């Protein structure tokens, strides 16, 4: 049975509330509103750039032409604008109408509503059937009570978070999926969300003032969130279209029923496609042949508060046509399911001692080599065979390579294979040198290089680059001290990167607070750049340091504290470390003031608090400098 939301309900509600709102404007607190003004009489068309909107203002002020000049007092006299279906593309100039309380611009061609931002007295805004997407410019309209944005193609309504005073909201016929922000609008008594793409209505659970709620033509399957809305007079829930995530087709298909009433009980399907059956809590089908989807229709009368509604719709389960691909590696078979008509994900290439993997073929000996970038899964099961070819013999080359610093202990051999009886030493003494590769060979799937006049080593031990590359280089906030100075030095850049020069032995900085500025990673290790006393020193291996402060040690808290009488001369810092370069001042200026502690950290056994006033961030100080009572 088809139901239809009657639009007259919306406008009856609006008319009644409009009278109340108009009285509220008249008897309000008289607060002044900031708005743009004109200082001399100005032609209408110079103020309102859109021709159609200029005509609307002309008619409103009973002027003969849009070339007529108007004063700010005349513009101040306009308290409402009704210009539906007027081909208006822009409301530029409306910022000069500070006393507008009601604005009806349905059926126009508006996209940008930024000029509305300063209409502080606006209580009623109707923009149905436009092309408005961005709602952020409404955030300061604190008197806005009723808002209608139906038929706009809106998908993001997070801009409504700043309008908790709204009492009626109409968002039907849009593309909304996420209504989380509506949980903040607890004063709503009327809400229309029909004909959207909403499935999760949990954010509505706390809107207990709702009297009229329109949710038809969405993707809703669970009504539990509505159970507490006892003030409802009108509720619409018909024509839900619920689409499950696609699953693989099976001859005997079982799909859990997820349609739930307000009390959490399952709603029994009324009609099930393809001769399916319902065995609570599952819907079952016997599908000997592939079909691309199955579905069931549900219907459930619902009563919430005074509202009676028919909760009905369809649940559709899309099905994927899948077949089995078998990967055969010399008789060892691995199987996987793949959807018909899609590309197959290439498996990891297999290895075979003394052979090179050639590719996956449709036959053991020959056939078609499968191209994972262009070939698609057919509508039947099939096997792909791993085909290998004998390894190529070694060949002459002429290359230049460098030892990767972290591979200095890798072996050098008489022949291209890892055998201790053939080992001639390590690469350590050849670091930082340009080495000539005169031959290459493959063995066991590994590429080997012969270093001229030295011997064979794996290609993975060598690099095209003389210097290490940094994997990342980022700013950090931390403090550390030297833990192990032996054998460690400080460099202008991370060691073995281009331009790195020796600065000093690390032992020179033993016992000093080292402020960590940056972190970088090379193949050797992770490095810290540090400063002492405000002076940048250089880079050091992080393994040589003991980091006693990092931001992850900070924990949020909420306390009230006061400066202890005898601690006014103590300092506060940018971070919880007593280091002069990050010192920000003393506590004297905050004596007898109420301070808020919003974060704490324990650094080397010492508790620190991050403090601020109600309006100003101060910094970190030792907890011992503060007390709980004034």
Swiss-Prot record:
Null mutant phenotype: Deletion of inlB alone decreases host cell entry; the reduction varies from 99% to 37% depending on the cell line tested.
Domain LRRCT as annotated: residue spans: 241-330
Keyword Acetylation set for record: no
Cross-referenced PROSITE patterns: GW, LRR
Cellular component annotations (GO), alphabetically ordered: cytoplasm; extracellular region; peptidoglycan-based cell wall; plasma membrane
UniProt keyword Signal, yes or no: yes
Segments forming domain LRRNT: 31-76
GO molecular function terms noted in the UniProt entry: heparin binding; lipid binding
Source superkingdom: Bacteria
GW repeat region, necessary and sufficient for cell surface attachment, interacts with host C1QBP and with heparin: annotated segments: 399-630
SUPFAM superfamilies: E set domains (SSF81296), L domain-like (SSF52058), Prokaryotic SH3-related domain (SSF82057)
Entry coiled-coil feature ranges: none
InterPro entries reported for this sequence: Cu-Rt/internalin_Ig-like, GW_dom, GW_dom_sf, Ig_E-set, Inl_IR, InlB-like_B-rpt, Internalin_N, Leu-rich_rpt
Description of its domains: The N-terminus (36-79) resembles a truncated EF hand, the LRR region (80-240) has a curved form, while residues 241-321 form an Ig-like region; the whole region forms a curved tube. The LRR domain alone (31-241) binds mammalian MET and stimulates its Tyr-phosphorylation; the LRR plus Ig-like region (36-321) are required for receptor dimerization; adding the B-repeat allows the protein to scatter host cell colonies, and the GW domains, especially GW2 and GW3, potentiate MET activation.
Name of the protein in its database record: Internalin B
